[in-house]
Amino acid sequence: MLLYWILLPIVWVLAHILWRFEVIGRENLRTVRDGRAYVIAPNHIANLDPVFIAITVFDWKRLRILAKEELFKNPLAGWFLRCMGAVAIERGRGDTTTVEQLTNECKNGTGIMIFPEGTRTKTGKLGMIKSGAFVIAAAAGADMLPVRIIYGSKDGRMHLFCKIRIVFGTLIPAEELQIKDQSHKMAELRRMKNRLRDELEQLLADNAFAAPAVEAAPEPEQLPEKSEQP
């Protein structure tokens, strides 16, 4: 825990040297800082997305990040991720132990970051929204905060020194994330996923970087007409 508070300011400084950040919707972020359970649900483009969002949230409790197990195979990367609050999950294997651990921490007011797509989409477009974030939010009675991370590069991907825009959307209250009718569980989950997708798409539509202006091709120079000889 101590390493988290040592590393976080260092990472913040390094990140602000290498990239140019703009944060929008801080007032929406403040709504989850009252001790309530909350789940942060961002889109996912680059491996450093969780780090960028973590240094932006800078919560007084350590933010927990759900990350794929493969990222921990490198000893140095694994150490860094654990210090930053990341928890490894075995994808596709029904890792109920990790899910239960995160749910219990979330109930106690710890923020949980889960990428609802479950993987990166390098094009910047949203992939398929999965159910994991909603399962934990429903079990913990947590609010959900949609977050859109937008890279200001030509291809929409992360590059050194590019602009990065992190947009916090409007809170989705816990009451709207409860599965009230278990006989229609799949339909309820589909409704929630569509709601989150709509929120994330709207955040991009409202806050996308302006497309670079295309220079008009110069008009061909017209030669003076020759006068006719008598």
Q: Could you describe each region identified by the protein language model?
A:
Residues M1-N28, D59, P75-M84:
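A transmembrane-helix-recognition feature enriched in membrane-embedded lipid enzymes
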Residues L14, C83-A88, P116-T119:
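Short, basic, glycine/proline-bearing loop/turn elements
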Residues R20-I24, R93-T98:
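Glycine-rich, highly charged phosphate/nucleotide-binding loops
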Residues V32-R93:
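Catalytic core of membrane glycerolipid acyltransferases/transacylases, capturing the structured
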Residues T97-P230:
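Non-catalytic C-terminal accessory region of glycerolipid acyltransferases
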